[in-house]
Amino acid sequence: MSKIKPAKGAPYARILGVGGYRPTRVVPNEVILETIDSSDEWIRSRSGIQTRHWANDEETVAAMSIEASGKAIADAGITAAQVGAVIVSTVTHFKQTPAVATEIADKLGTNKAAAFDISAGCAGFGYGLTLAKGMIVEGSAEYVLVIGVERLSDLTDLEDRATAFLFGDGAGAVVVGPSNEPAIGPTIWGSEGDKAETIKQTVPWTDYREGGVERFPAITQEGQAVFRWAVFEMAKVAQQALDAAGVAAADLDVFIPHQANERIIDSMVKTLKLPESVTVARDVRTTGNTSAASIPLAMERLLATGEAKSGDTALVIGFGAGLVYAASVVTLP
């Protein structure tokens, strides 16, 4: 009987670089109010959102990803040819096949890197980060590019008072590579498929194709149910991630939750009893909810503005449609 040779990977993995891309068009709440009966004050009080970015025709999922990835690769101090795998998390690449990751890998100039898409909604970045960590430790890649990218404006119903103001577009990317010490903690992840109706696409693509519906599919959600789930259940998941990493809330430097809603963020901070010394990402105010892109975009902005620094210990958690979630403690690049 032949024995399979064991893989030889790095002892640990870490985030080496981060990059982001926000579309050029900035959309204030006043534009949203043209199609819904609401007010700027109501939107801000309910979500914290003041503006969001919407992509133009040239700012495709692939184009935004390439821009963000180029910055992440440069920040990591490597070349595109060294990237061994490209993982893209998105729900707004409207071709079932091929995966947009293959186009991105090619246009970046990788050397035939493995490339694939994943669909895990707003938790997608955490899922991709976990896969990348495993690939590096297992030895199937030395450097992995993880991208979260969305054009949620394409799936926004501007007449839906509950969601019209929420969503934005953008791309965030990180390079994950080898490390001699732990820098990405254990992932606490999972799904609650019994709550699938809480956040969903209004109708399947096939219904639209067959003429069964007149309106283009959009994302809808049960706002109160999502809020309660995020505040009460996701705070527990975040605490589990801290416990698994052996890090106390008082020892954190940064908290980067999915940028869904500032009220949710505030409630999680309170439930986790985070001290005032912890920097909390609030990119949602000017970027809106960008689903899979929200965590890397928020991470990039904190580092760019100096609110966080390389080497800081950060708790990251994503949660959304599925319902799915993923949380871990990481060292910032």
Swiss-Prot record:
Localization of this protein: Cytoplasm
Signal peptide positions on this chain: none
Enzyme class of the recorded protein, top EC level: transferase
Family annotation (CDD domains): KAS_III
Record GO biological process: fatty acid biosynthetic process; secondary metabolite biosynthetic process
Domain of life: Bacteria
Primary localization: cytoplasm
Active-site feature positions: C122, H258, N289
Notes on how activity is controlled: Inhibited by thiolactomycin.
Short name of any one Pfam family annotated for the protein: ACP_syn_III
The EC number(s) this enzyme carries: 2.3.1.180, 2.3.1.300
A single Gene Ontology CC term: cytoplasm
Catalytic activity line of the entry: butanoyl-CoA + malonyl-[ACP] + H(+) = 3-oxohexanoyl-[ACP] + CO2 + CoA; malonyl-[ACP] + acetyl-CoA + H(+) = 3-oxobutanoyl-[ACP] + CO2 + CoA; 2-methylpropanoyl-CoA + malonyl-[ACP] + H(+) = 4-methyl-3-oxopentanoyl-[ACP] + CO2 + CoA
Family that this chain belongs to: Belongs to the thiolase-like superfamily. FabH family.
Domain note: The last Arg residue of the ACP-binding site is essential for the weak association between ACP/AcpP and FabH.
Known function: Catalyzes the condensation reaction of fatty acid synthesis by the addition to an acyl acceptor of two carbons from malonyl-ACP. Catalyzes the first condensation reaction which initiates fatty acid synthesis and may therefore play a role in governing the total rate of fatty acid production. Possesses both acetoacetyl-ACP synthase and acetyl transacylase activities. Utilizes both straight and branched-chain acyl-CoAs. The order of reactivity with the various acyl-CoA substrates at saturation is butanoyl-CoA > acetyl-CoA > 2-methylpropanoyl-CoA (or isobutyryl-CoA).
HAMAP family documented for this protein: FabH
PANTHER family (alphabetical): 3-OXOACYL-[ACYL-CARRIER-PROTEIN] SYNTHASE 3, BETA-KETOACYL-[ACYL-CARRIER-PROTEIN] SYNTHASE III
Record note on quaternary structure: Homodimer.
NCBIfam families: fabH, PRK09352.1
Protein name: Beta-ketoacyl-[acyl-carrier-protein] synthase III
Taxonomic source organism: Streptomyces glaucescens
Gene that encodes it: fabH
